[in-house]
Amino acid sequence: MFIDVGAASLFFDVVGESLNASTPDMSQRPTMILLHGGPGYDHSTLRPYFDRYSDTHQLVYLDHRGCGRSTGEQKTWYLDRWADDLAEFCRTLGINFPVVFGQSFGGMVAMHYAARYPSEVSKLILSSTAAQFRLDDTVKMMRELGGDYAAEIAHQFFSNPSQEAYDAYGEICLPLYSNPNASDAGNFRNRAIERP
């Protein structure tokens, strides 16, 4: 589904019911909004891990502005705008006091949202994220994990993004984030809609 927010069309998917039909009073389930990593990926990377919680929460998967199926011009890709998108999204759909889960980049958006709108979030769950991005630390990590070539690609990707840099980062650097012995290492790229 799509919703227009701040000159962008945001894609979202809902799993689970808002009202619990198995209770006599049709009690309201908490809504959990799930924010994917990236930028450049979509919510499908989270679905295999979180759909199972639809028996206790209504799950709302959101593709950030400019990511996945969502639109939005690159000049509007910044944390204030992504946080404001989430606030407007919740207000428009009547989602009050959501539990907000943020993975990696989604965690940065979640923290920014909670800082800008502290009275509008009930809980914040953060996974594999940081309060701020440090290019030098990321380049150092890529050098340690993948050598000088991986460090060079990471620097190019984060300092001068292009389709070529995005493709190289996806091929060389992204696998370094995974356990190479895992049976599904790197398979998330097969399901995700990737956009630089």
Name each region found by the language model.
Residues 1-5:
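Short acidic-hydrophobic surface loop/beta-edge motif
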Residues 98, 102-104:
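Conserved alpha/beta-hydrolase "nucleophile elbow" surrounding the catalytic nucleophile
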